[in-house]
Amino acid sequence: MTYAPVKDVLSGKLAVDSEVTVRGWIRTRRDSKAGISFLAIYDGSCFDPIQAVVPNNLNNYNDEVLKLTTGCSVEVTGKIVASPAAGQAFELAATDVKVVGWVEDADTYPMAKTRHSIEYLREVAHLRPRTNVIGAVARVRHSLSQAIHRFYHEQGYYWLSAPLITASDCEGAGEMFRVSTLDLANLPRTESGDVDFNEDFFGKETFLTVSGQLNGEAYACALSKIYTFGPTFRAENSNTSRHLAEFWMVEPEVAFADLNDIAKLAEDMLKYVFAAVLEERRDDLEFFASRIDKDVINRLEQFVSSDFAQVDYTDAIQILLDSGREFEFPVEWGIDMSSEHERFLAEEHFKAPVIVKNYPKDIKAFYMRMNEDGKTVAAMDVLAPGIGEIIGGSQREERLDVLDARMVEMGIDPEHMNWYRDLRRYGTVPHAGFGLGFERLVSYVTGMGNVRDVIPFPRTPRNANF
């Protein structure tokens, strides 16, 4: 017996009149007065379910088929036939229906066929991939991640598995999750009364990583072009639609590169992955356009065909000041632009994706290369219409004396970063990279307004269920 994914049947990949078995779950069951039942079966391989037409002469029709409810798992064997109904080209003329798993109580099943709010679905995150919307998110997320890996592979980059446990704070923000095996009820103490981390598993303070960048720099300074793609963690007590405590980051790092090089890399990568998802996940994107955000497909197509605008931070601030717009957060040189400022630039002024460069040093991290003016660093943000910042990057400071001075200025002990400083001592090179928050990318592509709905099991303040 040939087992076939639903997508292969609906796409016409398999010949009409061929016999196949489809395995999946019941979306709906509809019974006609003529003694025929219509089962909508989905298996997650594509957005649409396949319709199985089940006659009442099957042995288990009355005892089982007529008792099937949303969520039951089945194996249905039958012939592929042309569908007379509108909506799909093919359906299954069933000759056998095997019930694999029943829903215990159809009346209390959390994923009954009525539509649920996104907020409710977060409470049943283990069941929400069974819905149209979260299933579509999962497929889009997969296609985006595979496109990212393809892009970097085709460009000659090596994928680096950066460590999740670290003693370094890349961002210098201090909002990190501590990793410890010490007994919280009986902490070892030094003579001064501080916690004695020498007694801990690693013999020092360790944390979950906020970024793979610093480790990526080490490998870029040997392999020339690398990227990391993995989970990162921020202990930031932010309950917003844009923040997660655990999220995924894409972080390329390139030796012998400057700010302009990675600005071009960011543009090329985004256009590549958006073109890929438009081609691979059209059915899912059409669903998002009809139910979530009508501009999803048009926005992605425009993004792929647009030339990115570029502007210096100083000029961007002047544009905001000259706009006459009364922003919620006042505009002045030196601010870290808020989402409303970023979206004004991308959506109303440039009407295109825009790369803002050369930010004030006081709002950026210690590792960003100091510009000749002594006031700004070679940093960039990519701002996308509809969401604002989607990528942040910089040229890294490759001069040891300047890096040391910057760390001291920001209260970081250079001795704690000796391994990082070694990269400047031994064959230093100009290098640059950026970070892309993967969940923000998925949110942008799907139109889902909250990053909690584009990661399988969101981790947020006061929430680590499942």
From Swiss-Prot:
Any one Gene Ontology BP term: asparaginyl-tRNA aminoacylation
Name of the protein in question: Asparagine--tRNA ligase
Gene Ontology molecular function, alphabetical: asparagine-tRNA ligase activity; ATP binding; nucleic acid binding
Chain's gene name: asnS
Subunit note: Homodimer.
Top EC category: ligase
InterPro entries on file: Aa-tRNA-synt_II, aa-tRNA-synth_II, aa-tRNA-synth_II/BPL/LPL, Asn-tRNA-ligase, Asp/Asn-tRNA-synth_IIb, NA-bd_OB-fold, NA-bd_OB_tRNA
Localization: Cytoplasm
Catalytic reactions on record: tRNA(Asn) + L-asparagine + ATP = L-asparaginyl-tRNA(Asn) + AMP + diphosphate + H(+)
EC number of the protein: 6.1.1.22
Lineage: Bacteria, Pseudomonadati, Pseudomonadota, Gammaproteobacteria, Vibrionales
Keyword Mitochondrion belongs to the record: no
GO cellular component annotations of the record: cytoplasm
Organism: Vibrio vulnificus (strain YJ016)
